Amino acid sequence: MDIVYQSHHATVPERVRLNASRALERLGLRLTRPVSGVIRFEEDGRMRRVELELVGRGRRLVAEGTGRYFGPALAAALAHLEAQLRRVGRLNVRRARRPVRA
């Protein structure tokens, strides 16, 4: 899976980038055939914003987290993305369990 980093007016520590890429790859395994991922870091005054985008086989999931530091913002974005993946998984299970009408 290709991961692209984008930083808008932000200096991001290497450790945060590494944590973000590992987490996105881990969550990408739960999505059917992940194609690419984008991690955006943004800094505006005291607020930090992290946006995660995961693209895979007809689905595009986007999650955003904000906080005073990049660590908590990343954790919030990962929680949002994980919730979206749970919802997508439930949708796939519901579709698979449809009874066949004769």
Residue map of PLM features:
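N-terminal, polar/charged subdomain of small-to-medium soluble alpha/beta proteins
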Residues: 1-102
